[in-house]
Amino acid sequence: ASNVPKELVEKGQNRV
């Protein structure tokens, strides 16, 4: 989780 949008972080998707 380096430069991932908070939108994905909230969903628990730290992998793009």
Swiss-Prot record:
- Primary location recorded for the protein, binned into one broad class: mitochondrion
Q: Identify one Gene Ontology CC term for this UniProt entry.
A: mitochondrial matrix
Compartments where located: Mitochondrion matrix
Q: Which keywords has UniProt assigned to this entry?
A: Mitochondrion
Q: Which domain of life is it from?
A: Eukaryota
Q: What is this protein called?
A: Unidentified mitochondrial matrix protein
